[in-house]
Structure formats: structure tokens, C-alpha cells
Amino acid sequence: MNEKYSALFTPWKIGNVEIKNRIVQPSMGGTSLFGWLEPCHFDKEAAYHILNRAQNNVGLVLPGMQCVRDTMGGRWLYQNKKMFKDLAEWLPEFHKTGSKLFVQLSAGMGRSMAINEIMVKMLQNKAFGAVGKPFLNVDYITASASATPNRWYPECKSRPLTVEEIHEMVDAFAKTAKLLQDAGVDGVEIHAVHEGYLLDPVSYTHLRAHE
């Protein structure tokens, strides 16, 4: 091996977690461990891919980002106890490789949520939106820090999250992170403080006058 690459194979630390080498697979679409745009569950196909990366000496693996609340159906991740049980049963096999697993948690898309024509109609027609709400609550998943135009359909405004909704989300991050820790996950990364996703305007550009 060329000596200039030797540093890639030395250990390093994030907090108190030591990672065996400097090879990292970052989060990317299609690798979410708990499913994506569907009711949350332990995704065996994603788990197979993640385990395969670890078996090929990737020191740190981050599955695709995971919203703390299901886009479809609106269930909070922490409410699915079976999913965390399945994760805990799988993780010992993953950890046999010596690799570490961090899970990327997200508050959601906010005004950057891509919406189609049906979703636009659900936003513009309150009765239609109410009918679809148990399956897809478009009003909630497009809500943002302030009343701002949707990134992809500026004719629709994202409503501001209520203070109660914000506190619910903060609580969900804490509960989900604790369940991940209890299952054996090595770390949590907070996703999406960029590109207008929900935590971006909350952190930087919101127009709110309270708290």
C-alpha cells in the first residue's frame, strides 16, 4: 500500500466512540434502516447492505437519514418498539465486524418538501386535505419555521409550526435517540441543517418573534 494512504487505516474518535479506521459511508438515499416514505419498520434489505459495507472494512456506517416522524401515517419513530427490538437483535452481528453505526435523525423537509399536484390540492382544499390526513398529513409535513413559500411550488405557503409541535419534535428526538442508544447504536447525527430543510430555517432564517 502506498504510504500516503496509511492514515486512512488509523483509528480516530468522535466523542468517546473510537472508530477503527477513517473510511466512512455517509447517509444516502435508499439506505434508510427504518424505511423511507412508508410506515417505519426495520428494513432487512437496508440492514443487509449496511452489514455488507461493514464486512468490507468501512469503519463508520451511517444509514440514510430518518425523520423522527413517519411521512406516511404520522407515527413517531419512538412509538414502534418492535422496530427497535429488531434493531437490537441485528446489531451484534454488525458489531462483530468492529465497525460503528451512527443513525442520522431529521426533523423533516419543511418548505423544501417536494410536493406533487395531489399534495397541492390537499393544501389548497381543506376538506380534501382532511380526508387524506390520516395517511398523508401534507399540512404538517410541509410546515416550516415561518409562513414561507414552498421551495418547489411557491404558490403554496408552508405554515409555521406551532410551539406545541416544536416541543413535541424536540421530545421525539430525545426519545428516539435514547431508544437507539439502548438498542446498541453507537451514535446519532442530526440531519438537514442545510438547503432549507426544516432545521435550517428554524436555526437561521425564521421570522418568529417568540422563544
Question: Each predicted region: which residue ranges?
Answer:
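N-terminal capping/small domains of soluble enzymes
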Residues: 1-108, 158, 169
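Generic structural signal for helix capping and beta-alpha/helix-loop junctions
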Residues: 70, 110-113, 197-198
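Conserved small/polar residues in nucleotide/adenosyl-binding loops
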Residues: 205-211
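Short beta-strand segments at enzyme active-site cores
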Residues: 61-65, 101-105, 183-198
